[in-house]
Amino acid sequence: MTADAAYQRGRALAEHLNPGMEVALRDRYGRWLPDAVAETVVGHGMGEVYAREGLDLKTRLLVTVGALAAMGGQTRPQLKVNVASALRAGASAREICEAIFQMHLYGGMPAAINALNAAIEVFEAEGTSP
C-alpha cells in the first residue's frame, strides 16, 4: 500500500472515530512540527496500524484503552479520545470498564480508578448509560 493510500484510509477512519481529529492535530502541532504529527497519527496510526487485519476495530480500541489505562494519569486526554472512539466502534460502556479494570493488575489500582473516572466523564458527556 502506498503512503498516500494509507493516509486516505486513515483519514476516513479518523473522521469516523473522531471527527475533526486531523484538523485539531494540524492546528495544534502543525506550526511546530509541519507534516509530522497529523500525518503520523492519521497515515501510520489509523491508515496502517488500526486498519490491519487480525483484530476488529472494536477490539483494537479496547486494547488501546487498556494500555492507556495501565500507563497512568499522564495519558488521560488520549484515554478519553480512545474511550469515545471505542464507543463509536461498537464497544459498550461495560466492555470499556472491564478493559480498564483488567489493567489494575498491571498498572495498579490508582491508575485503573483514574482511568475509570476519565471513562465515566466520556460516558456522561456522550449520554451513555451503564
UniProtKB/Swiss-Prot annotation:
InterPro entries: 4CMD/NDH-1_regulator, AhpD-like, CMD-like
Keywords for this protein: Cell membrane, Membrane
Membrane topology: Peripheral membrane protein
Function in brief: May have a role in the regulation of NDH-1 biosynthesis.
Subcellular location, principal: membrane
Gene3D superfamilies: AhpD-like (1.20.1290.10)
GO molecular function: peroxiredoxin activity
Localisation: Cell membrane
Descriptive protein name: Uncharacterized 13.8 kDa protein in nqo9-nqo10 intergenic region
GO annotation, cellular component aspect: plasma membrane
Keyword match Membrane: yes
